[in-house]
């Protein structure tokens, strides 16, 4: 799957797991107060950046562990109606890279977004 990460697409080790979309999560969840937490080693970029505002707005909070910088994720969340705070990035050596990342170096941290009502 494009954008999921090097280790998920190029490894013969490990175990296959089903992949679900944000739409699938929303269909499963019957709750009104939804929180989305991401720590998926790089897939957060393609998932968040390609998600329509209407889908993101179904979550009251979005918490993301980012791996390659935060700027494009923060911008997308702000434009989707969220108040956003984030942890200052820490540098780590490059592990893998995908098309949705800002850089090939790992700058990790956390983003917390609250939907503006």
What are these regions (language model features)?
Residues 1-117:
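Phosphate/nucleotide-binding beta-alpha loop and adjacent structural elements of enzyme active sites
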């Amino acid at each position: 799957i494009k954008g999921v990460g090097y280790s998920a697409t190029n490894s013969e080790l490990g175990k296959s797991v089903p992949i679900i979309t944000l739409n699938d999560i929303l269909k499963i969840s019957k709750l009104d107060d939804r929180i989305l937490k991401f720590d998926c080693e790089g897939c957060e970029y393609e998932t968040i950046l390609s998600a329509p505002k209407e889908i993101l707005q179904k979550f009251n909070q979005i918490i993301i562990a980012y791996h390659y910088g935060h700027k494009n994720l923060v911008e997308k969340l702000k434009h989707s109606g969220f108040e956003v705070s984030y942890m200052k990035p820490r540098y780590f050596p490059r592990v893998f890279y995908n098309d949705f990342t800002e850089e090939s170096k790992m700058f990790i941290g956390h983003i917390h977004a609250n939907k503006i009502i």
